[in-house]
């Protein structure tokens, strides 16, 4: 079995793929879109991509591709504790530029302002790419914000540990595929969820309220709602909602009511949620 992930080695996504599929062959891709397209081209059996961070919010590249272009769905979710490290080729040298993924830069911004107020920040496709770039340029006064695994992967030193702005920092990762995967027995499911994209009719007054009411009066709990541009005209949106899948039969009736209201529904995923332990504590 082949599993694709947002690479390179040492990225958070690589660690999630390793925890979830410890015995499978894993293939790194440069961008989230590349990972999903690899699945669509039948190069891999499952794709592992980030979908939401508890601090920075949704990963729009993932959600927008799945809504606008993708036919693939989420078949499992893994929640991973995020710890960011400041990595260098040699400790205690001046740092002029810090490289990382945009969300990692945002998570480490407060630390950088406090300890390196004049440092420049440059974006990369992933935290691990930043670590690899720093390792490949040992003569430059640069650093990377990346996971601890990237330090050992690329031979870097930890200049500062756990620099994330908020300690309670987690990222949801989706495993995309055609069927429910055989997740490692070291991970246990904690709940079941469904993710939907709703497109509202323009001629239905109170369309969003009526759409959400189909779940509310059936006692189906929402855990998230978010709007994204339809990319058709200014002010036109679709809505992403996450639901607890505790009553599948009721959910089917809700789908029927949405259809009767003229609300288009696209299932982005139906999946079990797994957690990776952080210092012995399971986190959702």
Question: How does the language model describe each region?
Answer:
Residues 1-284:
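Domain-level signature for soluble enzymes in the chorismate/prephenate branch of the shikimate pathway
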């Amino acid at each position: 079995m082949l599993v694709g992930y947002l690479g390179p080695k040492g990225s958070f996504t690589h660690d999630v793929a390793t925890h979830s599929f410890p015995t499978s062959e894993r293939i790194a891709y440069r961008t989230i879109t590349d990972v999903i397209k690899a699945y669509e081209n039948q190069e891999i059996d499952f794709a592992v991509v980030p979908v939401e961070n508890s601090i920075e919010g949704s990963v729009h590249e993932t959600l927008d591709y799945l809504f606008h272009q993708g036919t693939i769905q989420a078949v499992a979710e893994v929640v991973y504790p995020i710890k960011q490290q400041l990595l260098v080729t040699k400790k205690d040298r001046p740092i002029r530029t810090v490289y990382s993924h945009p969300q990692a830069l945002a998570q480490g911004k407060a630390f950088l302002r406090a300890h390196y107020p004049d440092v420049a920040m440059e974006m990369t496709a992933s935290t691990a790419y930043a670590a690899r770039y720093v390792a490949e340029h040992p003569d430059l006064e640069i650093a990377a914000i990346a996971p601890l695994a990237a330090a050992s992967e690329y031979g870097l030193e930890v200049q500062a540990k756990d620099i994330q702005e908020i300690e309670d920092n987690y990222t949801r990762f989706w495993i995309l595929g055609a069927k429910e995967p055989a997740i490692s027995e070291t991970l246990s499911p904690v709940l079941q969820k469904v993710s939907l994209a709703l497109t509202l009719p323009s001629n239905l007054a109170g369309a969003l309220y009526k759409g959400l009411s189909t779940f509310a009066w059936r006692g189906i709990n929402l855990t998230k709602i978010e709007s994204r541009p339809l990319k058709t005209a200014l002010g036109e949106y679709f809505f992403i909602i996450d639901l607890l899948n505790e009553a599948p039969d009721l959910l089917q009736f809700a789908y029927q009511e949405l259809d009767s209201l003229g609300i288009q529904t696209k299932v982005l995923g139906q999946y079990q949620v797994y957690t990776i332990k952080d210092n012995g504590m399971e986190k959702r």
